[in-house]
């Protein structure tokens, strides 16, 4: 995303950069720059967004093909030219369109070091809103392509445009074997000294300390994990110089070397101006050399979609290079370089340079210092914390799509090596899976998942997501489930759209619903299915009748939903049956009269709750289960809104613990999809003719609060109606089903929409003494946040928005002082939001945003007219217990059971159906323990017997007394009970033989171990390990 240079305006009037660096650095007695020739490594590159102000198809056809055609042609003709390429989605698309002759030429360019791949992912993924599994997916796509086509293993990260660097990226890149990492967008007050404003104390510490390069130790959980990191000192465009306008001191002028840009600011090099242009270039190099602890400079040469006219760029720069290199008095030597050449040079310096360390710290919130803001507010005041939430429906759809992709990956991988005697064509499934992978990778792009692209581009992203999900839902999942459950016949009648079946049923009909569990833990949890209003009963996979409940949801267009608990084996499938009963509760299907007596679904009538002026402050509405209650009261100060008021901890016999939750509303000052800038403090969202409903039943209890036609909240509490895990064996010591249950949390289903210049947030208020400390996660690790005033910026909007941080899926506040009854409030989400604690005891999640302000780069307002359902899970109570269960609950919440439906013909007795088709598929010998998560089980290539398997120990150091410890796991036997003597490779998989195991880097492009067929591994807290498994079916 770009990147109009004049809009940065790090003007010398504002940043007295030259003076500061000369005064503060040249006098540093440890400087290694003095009296040395400056070695300039010019990095030719083109930053190619996968959509932004145009769609990626438009960018590809109009720009990228031109760039690659011309650059490759130039490199072929001139071996002195070099180029660095990042976005592999574009490169692979282009590559597949080339002749075998040109492909051979390109391979030569790669082999001789002229064409160099940096990063190597599908995209430069966003770091503030993207889930780590999606990051791994998109990096694996790119890395596998580079490995298969060129034998290339990338080793340098190139994240030059994402809006703030996360520790997650540095951690994952380290696990991929990267040695070096280049970043760019950090708070510009970290980079530059603003000494015209004495109130910005401490600005420019990277300049003062010459710390634009540092050793980054990103993980609190692995102190040995590190990556050498370089911060671009002046963005990723070609060199430029900004200087005061002598005729107008309120303006500045820019001159530079972006030869495809405005020629008045970037004049072509000729004989008449070469001395002047060389002097400017050398001046820039001399200034920038003062920022580093050595005399080598990494200088980007390019910009957004540059090098469409490759000869123009190279020809002009050739003249400068020749002229400057031929005159040693300049003290500068320049060379075209690939990124690795720069880092290899820096690494070879003797004696080694000492660098600063950054430990466990990310670099959010990004702030761009625009001249207009600086002149208006005397500070930057441009906090990019808005994009953590912007366009939540897009973020939700992308996360749901990734969950669906995971289901498809698991089913495809399990099906390919499953022997049941039936022929099956896997080509269609692999095509659908490949497309879904590609779309998942595209959506990680830093202008896609962020919601920062133009509207029609965002629509294009939705179209991609819908097409990918449709293929997976219409073909992959139904077909693979039918294949895996086939016994005496191949079941091809499944479909993912249950409404088409359920809405056409008649009394006596029986619908089979098969639920796929993509997580390697046994699961028992409540599901809901939209149904027509009919009498029903539910049977499990063994035809046992089970309790169910029918609820009318007034917050969901008054539709009816069926709730019941489902048990599924780890990574497996369970089939449940819905029987349509007569009006008097009888089974009318003559072929199914042998079914046990049904338990008719309980019809729970939702009673409307009406405010009564005679109600006193003690009048309470309560929903609950055996663990806790939620208590609600009418709020006379907010139009008599029914409001959460307190919590009863029944397990610890603590009654009436204060907790409330309100929807609040900010008014925009000049918000856009990137930045969050509001007028002031929020106010409670005022309901218009509110309605309230209470639903009580054996499976679920609900309080529904309807603010208006497009805004509501429903609180749901589930009861545990299943007393044991049917899949546990005598040898299973994990006892997973008893640790994680869905009666441990309450759910809030927010259905929200914003008016113009309004932003809606959900705010929890408790008596937790969090001392302005709160926690959000980067998807993998919890990050400690501290509410504070940054850079002495006391504008009210800055105090608010500078303290919002990305919450990928988890956030919480906790009592900071030990007491007899410490409390913790934990919020789990299925998508990223901005989150904060603005006041002691409060936790806030920004849900949806809309603004009429026209953003300068996309030239559109943030006009989000969606009305999404945004669900969160809430865990309240003891911190030790909350931290023990929050991570497994988060994984399960993000990866729901995936149903497929089939109408059983009335002519087939139910007994014959379950004899023809299995009702259970159990691929693992036993459920994994809750601290061991099967992150990936993917057959990446259609013609390979290998599976990429990733395992992660999901608990952090100190998170849980019981689970924050190392795990021993025998991939051959599946034994996680420290039994290292089992050499009989029965496999932890039930239906599959494992003939070879190789440990690899995270993106599976480098081997870390020799092949074996039985491997005992140890995973420390939060450690990820990746393996290639060679599988074959058990006969």
UniProtKB/Swiss-Prot annotation:
Keyword hit for Transmembrane: no
Gene name of the encoded protein: manB
Enzyme class: hydrolase
SMART domains reported in the protein's UniProt record: Alpha-mann_mid
Cellular compartment(s): Secreted
Protein name in UniProt: Alpha-mannosidase B
InterPro entries registered for this protein in UniProt: Gal_mutarotase_sf_dom, Glyco_hydro/deAcase_b/a-brl, Glyco_hydro_38_C, Glyco_hydro_38_cen, Glyco_hydro_38_cen_sf, Glyco_hydro_38_N, Glyco_hydro_38_N_sf, Glyco_hydro_57/38_cen_sf
Entry's transmembrane regions: none
EC code: 3.2.1.24
Residues bound to Zn(2+): 47, 49, 161, 446
Signal peptide: 1-20
Active site (record annotation): 161 (nucleophile)
Catalytic reaction equation(s): Hydrolysis of terminal, non-reducing alpha-D-mannose residues in alpha-D-mannosides
Domain of life from the UniProt record: Eukaryota
Entry-listed glycosylation sites: 19, 30, 63, 245, 250, 270, 309, 327, 438, 487, 497, 503, 710, 719, 735, 792, 852, 863, 880, 962, 993
GO molecular function: alpha-mannosidase activity; carbohydrate binding; metal ion binding
Example GO BP: mannose metabolic process
UniProt main location, coarse: secreted
């Amino acid at each position: 995303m770009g990147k109009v240079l004049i809009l940065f305006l790090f003007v010398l009037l504002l940043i007295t950069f030259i003076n500061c660096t000369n005064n503060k650095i040249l006098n540093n007695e440890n400087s290694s720059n003095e009296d040395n020739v400056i070695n300039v490594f010019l990095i030719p590159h083109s930053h190619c967004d996968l959509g932004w102000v145009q769609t990626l198809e438009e960018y590809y056809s109009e720009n990228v093909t031109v760039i690659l055609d011309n650059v490759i042609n130039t490199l072929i003709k001139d071996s002195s030219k070099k180029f660095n390429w990042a976005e592999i989605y574009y490169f692979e698309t282009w590559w597949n369109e080339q002749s075998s002759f040109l492909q051979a030429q390109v391979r030569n360019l790669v082999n001789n070091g002229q064409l160099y791949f940096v990063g190597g992912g599908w995209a430069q993924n966003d770091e503030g809103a993207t889930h780590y599994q999606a990051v791994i997916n998109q990096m694996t796509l790119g890395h596998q392509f580079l490995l298969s086509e060129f034998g290339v293993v990338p080793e340098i990260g190139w994240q030059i445009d994402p809006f703030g660097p996360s520790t997650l990226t540095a951690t994952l890149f380290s696990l991929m074997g990267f040695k070096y990492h280049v970043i760019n967008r950090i708070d510009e007050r970290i980079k530059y000294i603003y000494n015209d404003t004495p109130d910005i104390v401490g600005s420019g510490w990277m300049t003062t300390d010459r710390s634009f390069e540092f050793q980054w130790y990103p993980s609190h959980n692995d102190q040995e994990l590190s990556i050498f990191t370089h911060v671009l000192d002046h963005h990723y465009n070609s060199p430029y110089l900004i200087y005061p306008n002598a005729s107008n001191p309120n303006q500045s002028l820019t001159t530079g070397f972006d030869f495809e840009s405005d020629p008045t600011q970037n004049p072509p090099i000729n004989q008449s101006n070469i001395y002047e242009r060389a002097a400017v270039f050398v001046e820039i190099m001399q200034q920038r050399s003062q920022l580093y602890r050595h005399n080598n400079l990494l200088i980007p040469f390019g910009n957004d979609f540059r090098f469409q006219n490759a000869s123009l760029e190279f020809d002009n720069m050739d003249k400068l290079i020749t002229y400057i290199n031929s005159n040693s008095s300049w003290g500068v030597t320049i060379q075209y370089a690939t990124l690795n050449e720069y880092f290899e040079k820096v690494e070879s310096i003797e004696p080694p340079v000492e660098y600063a360390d950054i430990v466990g710290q990310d670099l959010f919130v990004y702030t761009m210092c625009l001249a207009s803001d600086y002149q208006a507010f005397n500070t930057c005041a441009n906090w990019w914390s808005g994009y953590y939430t912007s366009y939540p429906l897009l973020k939700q759809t992308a996360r749901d799509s990734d969950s669906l992709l995971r289901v498809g990956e698991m089913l495809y991988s399990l099906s390919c090596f499953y022997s049941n005697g039936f022929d099956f064509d896997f080509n269609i499934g692999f095509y659908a899976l490949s497309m879904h992978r590609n779309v998942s990778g595209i959506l990680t792009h830093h202008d896609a998942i962020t919601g920062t692209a133009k509207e029609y581009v965002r629509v294009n992203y939705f179209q991609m997501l819908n097409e990918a999900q449709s293929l997976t839902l219409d073909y992959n999942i139904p077909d693979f489930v039918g294949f895996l459950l086939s016994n005496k016949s191949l079941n091809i009648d499944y479909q993912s759209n249950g409404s088409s079946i359920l809405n056409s049923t008649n009394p006596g009909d029986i619908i089979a619903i098969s639920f796929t569990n993509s997580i390697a833990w046994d699961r028992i949890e409540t599901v809901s299915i939209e149904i027509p209003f009919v009498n029903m009963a539910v049977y499990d996979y063994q035809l046992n009748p089970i309790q169910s409940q029918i609820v009318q949801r007034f917050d969901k267009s008054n539709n009816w939903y069926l709730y019941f608990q489902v048990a599924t084996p780890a990574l497996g499938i369970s089939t449940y049956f819905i029987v349509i009963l007569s009006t008097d509760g009888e089974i009318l299907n003559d072929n199914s009269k042998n079914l046990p007596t049904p338990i008719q679904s309980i019809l729970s009538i939702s009673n409307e709750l009406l405010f009564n002026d005679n109600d006193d402050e003690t009048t309470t509405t309560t929903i609950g289960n055996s663990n806790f209650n939620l208590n609600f009261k009418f709020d006379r100060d907010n139009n008599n809104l029914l409001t959460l008021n307190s919590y009863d901890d029944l397990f610890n016999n603590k009654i009436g613990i204060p907790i409330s939750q309100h929807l609040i509303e900010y008014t925009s000052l000049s918000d856009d999809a990137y930045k969050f800038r509001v007028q002031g403090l929020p106010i409670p969202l005022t309901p218009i003719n509110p309605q309230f409903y209470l639903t009580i039943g054996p499976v679920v209890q609900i309080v529904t609060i309807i603010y208006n036609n497009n805004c509501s909240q429903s609180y749901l509490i589930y009861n545990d109606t299943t007393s044991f895990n049917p899949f546990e064996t005598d040898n299973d010591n994990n006892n997973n089903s008893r640790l994680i249950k869905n009666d441990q949390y309450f759910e809030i289903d927010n259905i929200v929409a914003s008016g113009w210049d309004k932003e809606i947030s959900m705010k929890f208020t408790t008596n937790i003494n969090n001392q302005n400390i709160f926690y959000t996660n980067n998807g993998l690790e919890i990050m400690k946040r501290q509410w504070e005033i940054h850079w002495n910026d006391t504008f009210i909007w800055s105090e608010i928005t500078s303290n919002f941080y990305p919450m990928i899926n988890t956030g919480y506040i906790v009592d900071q002082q030990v007491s007899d009854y410490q409390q913790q409030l934990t919020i789990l989400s299925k998508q990223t939001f901005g989150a904060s604690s603005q006041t002691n005891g409060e936790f806030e999640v920004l849900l949806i945003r809309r603004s009429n302000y026209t953003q300068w780069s996309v030239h559109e307002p943030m006009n989000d007219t969606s009305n999404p359902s945004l669900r969160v899970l809430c865990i309240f109570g003891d911190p030790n217990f909350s931290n023990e269960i929050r991570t497994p609950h988060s994984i399960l919440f993000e990866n729901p059971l995936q149903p497929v439906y089939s109408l059983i013909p009335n002519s087939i007795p139910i007994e014959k159906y379950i004899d023809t088709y299995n009702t259970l598929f159990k691929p693992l010998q036993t459920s994994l323990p809750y601290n061991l998560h099967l992150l990936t089980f993917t057959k990446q290539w259609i013609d390979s017997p290998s599976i990429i398997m990733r395992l992660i120990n999901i608990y952090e150091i100190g998170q849980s007394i019981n689970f924050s410890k190392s795990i021993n796991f025998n991939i051959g036997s599946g034994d996680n009970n420290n039994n290292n003597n089992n050499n009989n490779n029965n496999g932890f998989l039930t239906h599959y033989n494992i003939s070879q195991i190789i440990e690899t880097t995270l993106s599976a492009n480098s081997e870390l171990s020799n092949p074996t067929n039985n491997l005992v591994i140890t995973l420390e807290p939060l450690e990820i390990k990746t393996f290639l498994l060679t599988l074959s079916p058990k006969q």
